[in-house]
């Protein structure tokens, strides 16, 4: 399988940089996978779990939004937050979700819709992290 260069950058750090076989991205308009030779594209990333495959190794990274750009040079993801899944504190993540739930009643209209959508994404991440932690 052909490889391509992938960089994952957040304001705090370069979370990943190297050659990979595939990257699966939680896109705002649907999840998508990138392989070598992918057509150029710029996409918005929603909160979710990004999966990097390099040979037999798979690495899951929690991203909380950002932008992905595929070019002839490879894939660059500029993430608002990027944390390797094993490094996520599940109790802190659950507390964040609880705070988000408590803030829902004070929102209306589009703000309410966005808050519910973001909460749903966080709950999906939590479910996958809890499922992965059990295996």
Swiss-Prot record:
Transmembrane segment boundaries: none
GO CC terms, sorted: plasma membrane; proton-transporting ATP synthase complex
MF-aspect GO terms: ATP binding; proton-transporting ATP synthase activity, rotational mechanism
UniProt keyword Transport, yes or no: yes
One Pfam family in the UniProt entry: ATP-synt_DE_N
Annotated membrane topology: Peripheral membrane protein
Places the protein is found: Cell inner membrane
UniProt keyword annotations, A-Z: ATP synthesis, Cell inner membrane, Cell membrane, CF(1), Hydrogen ion transport, Ion transport, Membrane, Transport
Subunit description: F-type ATPases have 2 components, CF(1) - the catalytic core - and CF(0) - the membrane proton channel. CF(1) has five subunits: alpha(3), beta(3), gamma(1), delta(1), epsilon(1). CF(0) has three main subunits: a, b and c.
Xref: HAMAP family: ATP_synth_epsil_bac (MF_00530)
General function of this protein: Produces ATP from ADP in the presence of a proton gradient across the membrane.
Family listed: Belongs to the ATPase epsilon chain family.
Entries under PANTHER family matching the protein: ATP SYNTHASE DELTA/EPSILON CHAIN, ATP SYNTHASE EPSILON CHAIN, CHLOROPLASTIC
Full protein name: ATP synthase epsilon chain
Organism in which the protein naturally occurs: Rhodopseudomonas palustris (strain TIE-1)
Designated gene of the protein: atpC
